[in-house]
Amino acid sequence: MAVIKAVDMSEKMQQEAIHAAVQAMEKFTIEKDIAAFIKREFDKKFSPTWHCIVGRNFGSFVTHESRHFIYFYLGTVAFLLFKSG
């Protein structure tokens, strides 16, 4: 189950983000590959340019487009997904 820590995104888009993260975790084990999968899915579905960070320990400070940001956990893995640029 996903635990959302911070969000500025429609409910539909939130569900898509969590779904993409679950799919990525099933397909890949390397965090860079997980992030790349999610980024590409969102670039396709919601037009570029999305950025995705996946990991167990990172800090962040980002600028994002309004209504295009989510930060959540699946287990012990954090996902930061946002659109900028």
UniProtKB/Swiss-Prot annotation:
Gene assigned in the entry: dlc2
InterPro entries: DLC_sf, Dynein_light_1/2_CS, Dynein_light_chain_typ-1/2
Biological processes, Gene Ontology terms: ascospore formation; dynein-driven meiotic oscillatory nuclear movement; mRNA transport; protein transport
Gene Ontology CC entries for this record: cytoplasmic dynein complex; cytosol; meiotic spindle pole body; microtubule; nuclear periphery; nuclear pore; nucleus
Protein's recorded name: Dynein light chain 1, cytoplasmic
Alphabetical keyword list: Cytoplasm, Cytoskeleton, Dynein, Microtubule, Motor protein, mRNA transport, Nuclear pore complex, Nucleus, Protein transport, Translocation, Transport
Assembly and interaction partners: Homodimer. Cytoplasmic dynein consists of two catalytic heavy chains (HCs) and a number of non-catalytic subunits which present intermediate chains (ICs), light intermediate chains (LICs) and light chains (LCs). Component of the nuclear pore complex (NPC). NPC constitutes the exclusive means of nucleocytoplasmic transport. NPCs allow the passive diffusion of ions and small molecules and the active, nuclear transport receptor-mediated bidirectional transport of macromolecules such as proteins, RNAs, ribonucleoparticles (RNPs), and ribosomal subunits across the nuclear envelope.
Chief location: cytoplasm
Protein's organism: Schizosaccharomyces pombe (strain 972 / ATCC 24843) (Fission yeast)
Described function: Acts as one of several non-catalytic accessory components of the cytoplasmic dynein complex that are thought to be involved in linking dynein to cargos and to adapter proteins that regulate dynein function. Cytoplasmic dynein 1 acts as a motor for the intracellular retrograde motility of vesicles and organelles along microtubules. May play a role in changing or maintaining the spatial distribution of cytoskeletal structures. Also a component of the nuclear pore complex.
Pfam families recorded: Dynein_light
Localization annotation: Cytoplasm, Cytoskeleton; Nucleus, Nuclear pore complex
Stated family: Belongs to the dynein light chain family.
GO molecular function terms attached to this record: ATP hydrolysis activity; dynein intermediate chain binding
Keyword Nucleus in record: yes
Keyword Cytoplasm: yes
